Amino acid sequence: MDKIKLGFVPTRRSIFSAPDAIKYRGLTADRLREIGVDIVDIDDINDEGLLFDDSHIEPIVKKFRAEGVDGIMLCHANFGTEYVCARLARELGLPVLLWGPRDERPEPDGTRLRDSQCGLFATGKVLRRFQVPFTYMTNCRLTDPEFERGVWDFLAVCNVVKTFKRTRILQMATRPFDFWSTMCNEGELLERFNIQLSPIPMTELVQAVRDAQADEQAMAAMLAHIADSFEICIPEDKVPAVAGLAIAMKRLVEKYGCNAGAIQCWNALQDELGIMPCAANAILNEMGIPIVCETDIHGAITALMVEAADLGRHRGMFADWTVRHPDNENGELLQHCGPWPCSCAAVKPKLTYPLAFDHPGALTAEAKHGDLTLARFDGDNGEYSLLLGNARGIDGPAGMGTYLWVEVENLKRLEAKIVEGPYIHHCVAIHANVVPVLYEACKYIGIQPDLYDSIEEDVKAYLRGE
């Protein structure tokens, strides 16, 4: 599972009980550690370990940056000091979780010790004034289930934001000429999102494969992995090319400091190596290095986002929306020539030939059924959005490639969204419900969430703890 560091920032206000604020900052820190959160505390910033003065901001910022914090939690141990919270949040520029523990029953004489809820109202407004996006977790008790759920969902949001803003994609050759739908604006991706591409020509990839094939130790290990992972249904003399391509792509990803890749797939690669790249893609995808087809840069971005939203617990499946189910009005075939990781398959994949080409190197296997999230990051004309929603695996006719028949709530609505854009026929599926996390992450990365199901109010209700 991916690791996320949370900066823990408890805050108080002078007119309410300092001892009670100190008590709750300790209880909250203990609870966060109990549920497995890696926190960076401010208990060394001052004697109370609380934020309530401008002088605390600089040392907190310095500490959090040195520790590599990925997001911060503004914990209102009492009412809190809203303007100091906002100044800190703006200076850090990280995702913000706003929360305060539910207030106790007032004292017999009517005295209230904390008024944490009231402080949340104030801080929410001031964060807006400072134009700081934030995530609100409902005012609840530390032992309430929505506390643990909300914290972990926020950590997943932080993971999406961190991954998105640090994306660098290995682009292996140009897009295929016939695939105008996969064109992207490299300059705009860099200017708006800090998403970088590392383009290399096909000749560099082919040479890297030749170099890999000359490495006997690396080849022996990869060939053993292939024999263990796949049922081999292609000529034995073609398997080393699959192994060499997998090794080469991994080395190139590391050489250029990338976290994903996109490959041309056809036809130049077949002229040089005599194979399709699908199985090699699947091997890297299983490693947590998304490699997508047809040089689909936006598809690679989607794969990174979807896996980050699940904290790396499951692997994504880069797929085509292809044809409608012959019997189910809301059924659709997700399929591609074979880049899906083995962990997603319901059976041992066959290393074989693809549907539309004569060269070996594809995989065939039906994916596991179950509940899924489907997503697609895309854009055109300067506007970017994230199409997302739920689906479930269903039975259907046997297929070729890696495939899964799925059912959605309303296929006609989804179909119209894809056609009318800015999306294309590619998406990424994952065996997890990460719709709320992706929806919330969009506010931090400057894109619009676009739900293809009529569930927006349900998603908002989930996020606020209902």
Task: Describe each PLM feature range.
Residues 55-69, 88, 247-255:
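Short, well-structured alpha-helical segments in soluble
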Residues 2-6, 39-40, 100, 104-221, ...:
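Cap/lid and interdomain-hinge subdomains that line or gate substrate/regulatory clefts
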Residues 133, 285-401:
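C-terminal catalytic subdomain
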Residues 221-222, 228-309:
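Long, internal scaffold/assembly segments composed of regular secondary structure
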Residues 37-67, 207-216:
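N-terminal beta-loop-helix "entrance" segment that forms/cooperates
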Residues 1-34:
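N-terminal basic/disordered segments at the start of proteins
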Residues 358-466:
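Extended hydrophobic packing segments that form well-structured cores
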Residues 78-93, 270-282:
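Short Gly/Thr/Asp-enriched flexible loops that form oxyanion-binding sites at enzyme active sites
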